[in-house]
Each structure stands twice: as structure tokens, then as C-alpha cells.
């Protein structure tokens, strides 16, 4: 089964994020992504590489034009069951609905029975259940070992513990599931990264770095020098000086960047 929601797209295009792989330099794109070792990461704003899947969680529904554009034009849209009602208010149809079903009315379960995939186990939250479902239904490029690119929307807001958990899952998906995850909010976007990576940016863009496993951590192109942070707050509230910056690292970390518009 290949999940595909293209028939529901009126525009046929969607926002993209470039690939993030070690020792790679990608050409500049007006999308969203990274460059690592050196890998490349353009700013969010145009059309670049494609998303394998867009996953909508049941946090605050997007209101910013960029995540809404991604949502409306996604080819493969997997929705956590708790977000289905909000999605339908925007007249957007999902490719699949995933979850334990406790957030769905019987009417919606029957209406979407053909694409509803109940998963009752309790070890993972609905965001991870949706990710595992999408991951298992994608054809992978074994010859190039290309990571699929997943975009996460509606994954912040409402309960703060869910927000913190969902952000931390970006590294779990990156390391354990071999995908390139990007969490897009109304204010900016989070990406998981590893090793030395060059990130496209813009002057004045607000940047935060959250260290996970780095014992060596430095930067070029940011207003304030960084170091191997031992606390999450220590890498917040930095600023890009130009159209790109580079993180030199020997481990994993999460980067947050604000939208330009």
C-alpha cells in the first residue's frame, strides 16, 4: 500500500523540506531543511524537495499560512484521530486516520472506516503510532538509502507535557526510525540534526539549539557562540547573522528557527 492523497489536492504542489544527511551539500532551495557535514538546510518559504508524509496531531490546529499550506496540499496526510474533527472543519480529507479511537465519535468511525486504522497499544502516543503506520507503508529507496521526510503539524499547544514529549520525539524518529522529521508550528520549525551541519537562514532569524548528545558543539554565523550545553535553556534565543549558519558537533541536537513571515 502506498499512501497518497494527491487526488484531494487542488493545487498539486506542497511545501517542502530539503534532505538532511551527513557529508552532503545540497543546492539552495526555497524550502525548509538542513545541510549536514556539510548538509544543507534552506529557509521555509518556497518549493523544494518533497515530504513523504504530513502528520497532523491533536494539539493546536495550525493558523499560520505556511503550515496551513502544507496541510491543504499534502499528498500523504495521516491524521491522529483526535485531530480529525478539526481537519474536517477546513474541508480537508485525510489519507488515513490513526489512533486508539477514544477521540472519535461512532459516526466518524463509520464514515472513515475505510481509512481508519485503530492501534490500541499504549506504549506509544498517537503521534508515534501515526509515524510508524506511515513509515511501514512507504516504499524506501534502498539503493540511495534516502531518508523519508516527515512533516508534523498540530504537535504543540494544549497540554505542555504533550508538547515537550512531541518535540523530543523528533530525535527519536531521526535516530531510531531513520526519517528526517520536521515539526512546523505557527511560529517556526524544529529539525533534528547530527554532526556538522550548515543551515540556511536569513539575517535576524531567531535560532535555538537543544543539545542531546554532543560533547563538542560550536557554531559559525550566529550572534552568540555556542558550546556543549548541559541544560536545554542554554542554547535558546540565538540569532542568525546572514543567510546561513553552521553547527559543528559530534552528536545529535535539535534546531529551532522562526518563520520569516
Language-model segments: residues:
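Glycine-biased, low-complexity coil/linker segments
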Residues: 30-33, 45-47
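N-terminal, intrinsically disordered charge-dense segments
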Residues: 13-16
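Long, charged alpha-helical interface segments
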Residues: 193-261
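N-terminal beta-strand-loop-alpha-helix module at the start
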Residues: 51-111
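Anionic-ligand-binding alpha/beta catalytic cores of soluble enzymes and soluble regulatory domains
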Residues: 149-195
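Short glycine/serine/threonine-rich phosphate/pyrophosphate-binding segments
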Residues: 63-65, 125-128, 159-164
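Short phosphate-binding loop-to-helix
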Residues: 113-142
Amino acid at each position: 500500500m502506498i499512501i497518497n492523497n494527491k487526488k484531494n489536492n487542488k493545487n498539486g504542489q506542497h511545501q517542502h523540506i530539503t534532505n538532511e544527511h551527513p557529508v552532503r551539500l545540497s543546492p539552495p532551495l526555497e524550502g525548509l531543511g538542513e545541510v549536514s557535514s556539510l548538509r544543507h538546510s534552506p529557509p521555509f518559504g518556497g518549493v523544494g524537495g518533497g515530504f513523504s508524509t504530513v502528520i497532523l496531531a491533536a494539539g493546536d490546529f495550525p493558523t499560520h499560512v505556511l503550515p496551513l499550506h502544507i496541510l491543504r496540499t499534502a499528498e500523504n496526510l495521516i491524521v491522529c484521530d483526535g485531530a480529525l474533527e478539526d481537519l474536517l472543519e477546513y474541508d480537508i480529507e485525510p489519507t488515513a486516520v490513526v489512533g486508539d479511537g477514544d477521540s472519535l465519535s461512532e459516526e466518524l468511525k463509520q464514515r472513515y472506516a475505510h481509512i481508519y486504522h485503530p492501534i490500541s497499544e499504549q506504549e506509544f502516543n498517537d503521534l508515534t503510532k501515526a509515524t510508524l503506520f506511515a513509515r511501514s507503508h512507504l516504499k524506501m529507496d534502498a539503493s540511495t538509502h534516502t531518508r523519508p521526510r516527515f512533516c508534523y503539524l498540530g504537535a504543540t499547544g494544549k497540554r505542555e507535557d504533550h508538547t515537550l514529549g512531541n518535540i523530543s520525539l523528533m530525535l527519536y524518529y531521526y535516530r531510531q526510525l531513520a526519517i528526517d522529521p520536521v515539526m512546523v508550528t505557527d511560529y517556526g520549525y524544529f529539525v533534528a540534526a547530527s554532526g556538522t551541519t550548515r543551515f540556511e537562514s536569513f539575517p535576524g532569524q531567531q535560532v535555538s539549539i537543544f543539545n542531546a548528545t554532543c560533547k563538542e558543539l560550536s557554531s559559525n554565523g550566529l550572534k552568540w557562540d555556542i558550546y556543549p550545553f548541559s541544560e536545554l535553556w542554554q542554547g535558546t534565543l540565538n540569532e542568525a547573522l546572514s543567510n546561513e549558519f553552521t553547527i559543528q558537533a559530534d552528536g545529535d541536537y535539535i534546531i529551532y528557527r522562526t518563520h520569516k513571515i
